[in-house]
């Protein structure tokens, strides 16, 4: 899980979602998981 000011899709499997007011990237590749903070 990377915590970043700006979250971006890294590959085509990445999805940007908003969960409890937090922007997250979920992906089948665990390295691509990010959240905004």
Curated annotation (Swiss-Prot):
This is Large ribosomal subunit protein bL36A. It comes from the Bacteria. It comes from Vibrio cholerae serotype O1 (strain ATCC 39315 / El Tor Inaba N16961). HAMAP family: Ribosomal_bL36 (MF_00251). InterPro entries: Ribosomal_bL36 (IPR000473), Ribosomal_bL36_sp (IPR035977). Belongs to the bacterial ribosomal protein bL36 family. One of its GO terms (biological process) is translation. Transmembrane segments: none annotated. Pfam families: Ribosomal_L36. GO terms for molecular function: structural constituent of ribosome. Keywords: Ribonucleoprotein, Ribosomal protein. One of its GO terms (cellular component) is cytoplasm. Coiled coil: none annotated.
